[in-house]
């Protein structure tokens, strides 16, 4: 099943018991966060607050609060099925030469499908049913969530920021938080390495002093939203990838104030510009680390136009100590990463980003070890292969007999197969999440790799221990007589 807009996905979730309408008045100032946090931690449904205090625009929260709903957004029922998406991405990133004529013929449909998914431009789009300009523009009339007591101001969280640089043929879609600064101003918090910031940098170099056009889409269809957080190949637009997943082209329309193309079925569109000379202090805000972050200076986004659908829905979230919605999104997208990594490193058995590690700060990788030093090669490869892992501080590599998603197994491997000096890799002065205040310098810190694999000749001079395993015949016999022993139900092994 595919969804052309957010509303059809909401209907699908509600019909499947995955969305709850809240008619009781709830304040976007702190109350929504507390309710959404409790529901997410109990693995509850998406929430549609129909009567936000001080506003008549409904607020959608906790949309991707479980891996299952992330899968449902992509037309899947099981998060493990997201590996199909990873297989597709792996193919698009590095298609293998055909092994023969029949293989070449079999791959034609996939290439054809990928090439035939440019966005479809539509007229009279739903996102422009209502148009506000000049004095009508007032961001304070949106039910923007104020998430935590120490937050400096309300925060736009789920906006798809649409930019285009002079060096790129395609647009970039990115999700960057935006602090409410005034009726027509937001602070655009994008880090230097992110696509929007790079586009802006290139624009300033080519057009010094000029205003930079920017558009933010709120409440887009779920596939386009997820396309913006998926490792799409640089040569492919997020719109084309979303169309590929959906099975039909993404509908877009031209923005009113500039040439940028926006998702036509979005609930709300903010159009405007960034003046390269206008900066403002952003923060502090509670973030996915579970702490309030430091303040810093970022560009100001001036909104000149607000367009929206009739009876628009405001899509929002919060970030905090895991589990939060980004962490659950990370758990689901973990399955997308596995095939991509395996394509480059076939020896990888499994890959896990534990949500407790703030989605990406720690990774555990199980491998089919083939030679001394193999674990260290995999560490280096994971850090450098995808930009999503640039900020991963800790990588633990284990053997294929260890379940990398089970901390009992992982801790056992670390404590029995590692020597701290020999098996720990430390790398200094590497890119680190700017929000990681544990690093000695903002944006620059160290990484640690832990080789928790069995050691081969050349890695140790000692005889390596053999794991204790019970005889299978004995286990089978005990299974057969268990009910006669008068012991409670057999434990699950």
UniProtKB/Swiss-Prot annotation:
One GO MF term: metal ion binding
Catalytic activity: a 4-hydroxy-3-(all-trans-polyprenyl)benzoate + H(+) = a 2-(all-trans-polyprenyl)phenol + CO2
Cell membrane is among the record's keywords: yes
Gene Ontology BP term (one): ubiquinone biosynthetic process
Active site: 287 (proton donor)
GO cellular component: cytosol; plasma membrane
Pfam families reported in the protein's UniProt record: UbiD, UbiD_C, UbiD_N
Annotated prenylated FMN binding sites: 175-177, 189-191, 194-195
EC number(s) per entry: 4.1.1.98
Keyword entries, A-Z: Cell membrane, Decarboxylase, Flavoprotein, FMN, Lyase, Manganese, Membrane, Metal-binding, Ubiquinone biosynthesis
Entry coiled-coil feature ranges: none
Necessary cofactors: prenylated FMN; Mn(2+)
EC class: lyase
Cofactor binding note of this UniProt entry: Binds 1 prenylated FMN per subunit.
Main location as per UniProt: membrane
Protein's membrane topology: Peripheral membrane protein
Pathway assigned to this chain's UniProt record: Cofactor biosynthesis; ubiquinone biosynthesis
Transmembrane regions listed in the UniProt entry: none
UniProt: Mn(2+) binding residues: 172, 238
Annotated compartments: Cell membrane
Family (UniProt): Belongs to the UbiD family.
Complex formation: Homohexamer.
Purpose of the protein: Catalyzes the decarboxylation of 3-octaprenyl-4-hydroxy benzoate to 2-octaprenylphenol, an intermediate step in ubiquinone biosynthesis.
Protein name according to UniProt: 3-octaprenyl-4-hydroxybenzoate carboxy-lyase
Organism: Shewanella piezotolerans (strain WP3 / JCM 13877)
């Amino acid at each position: 099943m595919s969804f052309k807009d957010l509303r059809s996905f909401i209907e699908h979730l509600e019909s499947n018991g995955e969305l709850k309408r809240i008619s009781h008045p709830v304040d976007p100032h702190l109350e929504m966060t507390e309710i959404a946090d409790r529901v997410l931690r109990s693995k509850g449904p998406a929430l549609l607050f129909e009567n936000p205090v001080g506003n008549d625009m409904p607020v959608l929260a906790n949309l991707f609060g479980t891996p299952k709903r992330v899968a449902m957004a992509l037309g899947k029922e099981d998060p493990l099925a997201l590996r199909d998406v990873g297989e597709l991405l792996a193919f698009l990133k590095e298609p293998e030469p055909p092994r023969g004529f029949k293989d070449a013929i079999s791959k034609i449909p996939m290439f054809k499908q990928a090439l035939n998914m440019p966005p479809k431009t539509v007229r009279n789009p739903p996102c422009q049913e209502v148009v506000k300009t000049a004095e009508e523009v007032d961001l304070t009339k949106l039910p923007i969530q104020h998430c935590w007591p120490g937050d400096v101001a309300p925060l736009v969280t789920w906006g798809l920021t649409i930019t285009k640089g002079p060096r790129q043929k395609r647009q970039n879609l990115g999700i960057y938080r935006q602090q409410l600064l005034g009726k027509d101003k937001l602070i655009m918090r994008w880090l230097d390495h992110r696509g929007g910031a790079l586009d802006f940098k290139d624009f300033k170099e080519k057009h010094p002093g000029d205003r930079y056009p920017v558009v933010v889409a709120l409440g887009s269809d779920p596939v386009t939203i997820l396309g913006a957080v998926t490792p799409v190949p640089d040569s492919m637009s997020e719109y084309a990838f979303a169309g590929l997943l959906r099975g039909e082209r993404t509908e877009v329309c031209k923005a009113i104030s500039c040439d940028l193309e926006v998702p036509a079925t979005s609930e709300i569109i903010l159009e405007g510009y960034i003046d390269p000379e206008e900066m403002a202090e952003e923060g502090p805000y509670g973030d996915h680390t579970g702490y309030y972050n430091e303040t810093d200076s970022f560009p100001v986004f001036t909104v000149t136009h607000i367009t929206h659908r009739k009876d628009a829905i405001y899509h929002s979230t919060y970030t905090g100590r895991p589990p939060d919605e980004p962490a659950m999104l990370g758990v689901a997208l973990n399955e997308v990463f596995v095939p991509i990594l395996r394509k480059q490193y076939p020896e990888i058995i499994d890959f896990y980003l534990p949500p407790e590690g703030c989605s990406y700060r720690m990774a555990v990788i199980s491998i089919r070890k083939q030679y001394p030093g193999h674990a260290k090669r995999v560490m280096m490869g994971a850090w450098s292969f995808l930009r999503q892992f640039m900020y991963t501080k800790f990588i633990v590599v284990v053997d294929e007999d260890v379940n990398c998603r089970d901390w009992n197994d992982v801790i056992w491997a670390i404590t029995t197969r590692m020597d701290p000096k020999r098996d720990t890799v430390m790398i200094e002065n590497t890119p680190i999440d700017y929000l990681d205040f544990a690093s000695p310098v903002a944006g620059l810190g160290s990484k640690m790799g832990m080789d928790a694999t069995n050691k081969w000749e050349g890695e140790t001079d000692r005889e390596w221990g053999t794991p204790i395993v019970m005889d299978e015949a004995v286990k089978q016999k005990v299974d057969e007589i268990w009910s006669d022993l008068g012991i409670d139900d057999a434990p699950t092994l």
